[in-house]
From Swiss-Prot:
<dbReference type="GO" id="GO:0050688">
    <property type="term" value="P:regulation of defense response to virus"/>
</dbReference>
<feature type="transmembrane region" description="Helical">
    <location>
        <begin position="60"/>
        <end position="74"/>
    </location>
</feature>
<dbReference type="GO" id="GO:0001772">
    <property type="term" value="C:immunological synapse"/>
</dbReference>
<feature type="topological domain" description="Cytoplasmic">
    <location>
        <begin position="267"/>
        <end position="281"/>
    </location>
</feature>
<comment type="function">
    <text>Structural component of specialized membrane microdomains known as tetraspanin-enriched microdomains (TERMs), which act as platforms for receptor clustering and signaling. Participates thereby in diverse biological functions such as cell signal transduction, adhesion, migration and protein trafficking. Upon ligand binding, two signaling pathways are activated, one acting through phosphorylation by LYN leading to cell death or a survival pathway with activation of GSK3B. Plays an essential role for clustering of integrin ITGA4/ITGB1 and promotes its mobility in the plasma membrane of B-cells.</text>
</comment>
<keyword id="KW-0325">Glycoprotein</keyword>
<keyword id="KW-1133">Transmembrane helix</keyword>
<feature type="topological domain" description="Cytoplasmic">
    <location>
        <begin position="75"/>
        <end position="85"/>
    </location>
</feature>
<dbReference type="InterPro" id="IPR000301">
    <property type="entry name" value="Tetraspanin_animals"/>
</dbReference>
<dbReference type="InterPro" id="IPR018503">
    <property type="entry name" value="Tetraspanin_CS"/>
</dbReference>
<dbReference type="GO" id="GO:0042098">
    <property type="term" value="P:T cell proliferation"/>
</dbReference>
<feature type="topological domain" description="Extracellular">
    <location>
        <begin position="39"/>
        <end position="59"/>
    </location>
</feature>
<comment type="similarity">
    <text>Belongs to the tetraspanin (TM4SF) family.</text>
</comment>
<feature type="topological domain" description="Extracellular">
    <location>
        <begin position="112"/>
        <end position="241"/>
    </location>
</feature>
<dbReference type="InterPro" id="IPR018499">
    <property type="entry name" value="Tetraspanin/Peripherin"/>
</dbReference>
<keyword id="KW-1003">Cell membrane</keyword>
<comment type="subunit">
    <text>Interacts with SCIMP. Interacts with SOCS3. Interacts with DECTIN1/CLEC7A.</text>
</comment>
Length: 281
């Protein structure tokens, strides 16, 4: 066996093993997304999310898993069987994925101000129509969860919730905010979130009285709530994690470039046989 043949054989099995790993990973992602979609009780109780946005994300996971499996399968079969057509298709899909990521990165960088303004408009619109439109429930619950995770309230400040029609108080009452703004660390009491994500509520921390309606959990703005807006919290999160985000993006990009280089090198250096399927007929 010549040095070139040994190199091609090494590249072939290297591509096969790594794509087999990603095929298994895609299968796990697909199974995980399907499990979330099917399991409406125990998993939701564990995560603390309402089922509507969780169902949306589970579909995204399932589709991502299927696409990962399909791409990895092309790489596995194309490399192992030395099929130029599959290797070429594998290279083309990786190139399309890489170009899409580069395009998105450029658009986000150049249109950052416009994107921030658009996100602000969407958030403020969601706040203003909070619990008034059943079709927007998923977006509202997702924003509730964002406030809970980022430990913030409103976009610029909790005063943004004064525009919410369903939370507007009478002139004699103080303003209300959703329970997702509740700062449980101030009282070491997190049971308010049982009302936010589920229909039952056992108790709430001191000084925080609930305004209970059909499916709204709200508490006075003077209670123990987060005082920082989510715009500031999001900027802090991005600043603290920018190195990790850039590192992950660079790692994924380099991995895709490596697979593209190996696949096109293997494809170009195979014997000039354009249809290896004939041997299996």
């Amino acid at each position: 066996m010549s040095a070139q043949e040994s190199c091609l054989s090494l590249i072939k099995y290297f591509l096969f093993v790594f794509n087999l790993f990603f095929f298994v990973l895609g299968g796990l992602i697909f199974c995980f997304g399907t499990w979330i979609l099917i399991d409406k009780t125990s998993f939701v109780s564990f995560v603390g999310l309402s089922f509507v946005p969780l169902q949306t994300w589970s579909k995204v996971l399932a589709v991502s898993g299927v696409l990962t499996m399909a791409l990895a399968l092309l790489g596995c079969v194309g490399a192992l069987k030395e099929l130029r057509c599959l290797l070429g298709l594998y290279f083309g899909m990786l190139l399309l994925l890489f170009a899409t990521q580069i395009t998105l990165g450029i658009l986000i960088s150049t249109q950052r101000v416009r994107l921030e303004r658009r996100v602000q408009e969407l958030v403020l619109r969601t706040i203003q129509s909070y619990r008034t439109n059943p079709d927007e429930t998923a977006a509202e619950e997702s924003w509730d969860y964002a406030q809970f995770q980022l430990r913030c309230c409103g976009w610029q400040s909790p005063r943004d919730w004064n525009k919410a029609q369903m939370l507007k108080a009478n002139e004699s009452e103080e303003p209300f905010v959703p329970c997702s703004c509740y700062n449980s660390t101030a009282t070491n009491d997190s049971t308010v979130f049982d009302k936010l994500f589920f229909s039952q509520l056992s108790r709430l921390g001191p000084r925080a009285k609930l305004r209970q309606t059909a499916d709204i959990c709200a508490l006075p703005a003077k209670a123990h709530i987060y005082r920082e807006g989510c715009a500031q919290s999001l900027q802090k999160w991005l600043h603290n994690n920018i190195i990790s985000i850039v590192g992950i993006c660079l790692g994924v990009g380099l991995l895709e470039l490596g697979f593209m280089t190996l696949s096109i090198f293997l494809c170009r250096n195979l014997d000039h046989v354009y249809d290896r399927l004939a041997r299996y007929r």
